[in-house]
Amino acid sequence: MPNIEYYSVKKFNSIKQMMEMAVEDVADKIAFKYIENNESKEVTYKEFNEDTKYVGTALVNLNMHNNHVAVIGNNSYDWLTVYLTMLKTNGVLVPVDKELTKEDIINVLNNSDSEVLFYAEKFEQYIEEFKQKVPKIKYYIGFERAEDEDNVLSYAKFKKIGKESYEKGNKEYESIVPDTSKLRLLVYTSGTTGLAKGVMLSEKNLVADVYHGLEVSTVYDTCLSVLPYHHTYEAVAGILVALHHHATICINDNLKNVLKNIQLYKPEYIYLVPAFAEVFYKKVWSNAKSTGKDKILKIMIVVSNILRKIGIDLRKKLFKSIHEAFGDRLIKIVVGGAPVRKEIGKFFNSIGIDLINGYGITECSPLVSVNQDKFNDPSTVGLPLRCVQLKLDNITPEGEGEICVKGDNVMMGYYKNPEKTAEVLKDGWFNTGDYGKINSKGQLLITGRKKNLIVLENGKNVFPEEIEEYIMGIPYVQEVIVKGIKNDIGSETGLCAEVFLSEEKIQELDIKDPQTKIRKDITEATAKLPIYKRISEVQVRDKEFNKTTTNKIKR
């Protein structure tokens, strides 16, 4: 195990204390920047903390502050205000995926025992039906709604009433002492809601992840917040980490505008899933090739890496045009949620933008391991956090096993589902369902997902993610999944690659027969793999795969 130099992190026991520390230290610093109705907005740490007090006081007036409160909608300042408001109570925040079907939303609201729903305008059309099918909800509060009607309230008026009550001396919300051992965040895992489980996270879980994550990977003054807030990766590793660090959070308004907003806000760091890093990587090389500079770029990377070995770092100058494309201030991209291709990590590190790869899962709040700033190997997902014990279960002769985690970040269990909880939590160890290896330096390598495992009829086990990484190296492949080919009796006899190709890249590369070309290129890309891991069938899709809200392909 290497000697790791940990960052000094200011300790805190609760999210409420963390916010009080921020206001004490940087009251007038900008906490949030965002666009609303085509107008730029800025909110200081003091103003944000006051807004949470106003919303919290309004909830106290309804006697709902210790209850289950759901929120659904696009990433927004109002969404985050409700989020932090509830984290400072003894109630429970239920973030709901805005991409769920109406029926699935109803199931989540019922299963979570939510009694208040904060919602975006898109869901106004469902409120009357929710009233009939979600009997426990007592109040609906619309972010864009202008007027109150019975128990359907305007958020602006709701916050205003809370402010008036607070300023008249109602300090009940402010006097709450959170019990950090109790359920605070109830997050429903992605998937069909019939199978979705409510992951119970305590405040202690959240505090552990924020504190120990910052020990190994620091953040900087400005970030762009991109990923959906109902996912713990962004809600905890993105938002709470930034607030602890007193960073300015710039809220991305649309996934299609990420590069545009990087130019607008000029962030120093950003949290992403690998799909975004893949797009950025291919865009850089595509631009280089279209301008005839791809060979020069390759040479510059080699020269830069040689110079760095003798202590000369010219990356900011050598790759100035690339840095300018990313706002000219980007220092770090933190990638989680799925494995990232090794060559992408090495490329960004070579040009002077640190790509830090980590591993997390909702049930672990979510961070389990991450590459350290000073000990970064993008082919791994780094070392476990200091609050984490990690082991591999049922290890194969190749050294692979199921990743099991114990520590302060591990969930309390699944909400109202003791059977499923017992299946994955055994003697304090959480069985993740992910498989991996641990190298000689103690770093974790993810090899695949248990549920994706392909067992061939010859008894060989294949993790499709490994082969997909090779295929994604083909420049005009936009998306791929590898799956088993079943015979008449259901046995998996071989491997099929289902691919979606980039029409733009096909035209740019002047590929006349994409169907033939992709089969040839996949054969070449996987030639070094064992025979049983090679592709025997290729299917070309005419449209993209269906994806989750964090841009992961639904298998």
Residue ranges and their predicted role:
Residues 27-30, 142, 163-188, 195, ...:
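Conserved pre-ATP/AMP-binding loop-to-beta segment of ANL
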Residues 88-161, 503:
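Structural core segment of the AMP-binding/adenylate-forming
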Residues 42-46, 184-210:
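Conserved AMP-binding A3 loop
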Residues 100, 407, 412-413, 435-531:
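AMP-binding/adenylate-forming catalytic core of the ANL superfamily
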Residues 41-42, 56-100, 270, 314-444, 450-453, 478:
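Conserved AMP-binding/adenylate-forming
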Residues 207-225, 229-320, 354:
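Conserved AMP-binding/adenylation subdomain of ANL enzymes
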Residues 143-144, 478-479, 490, 523-552:
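AMP-binding/adenylate-forming catalytic domain of the ANL superfamily
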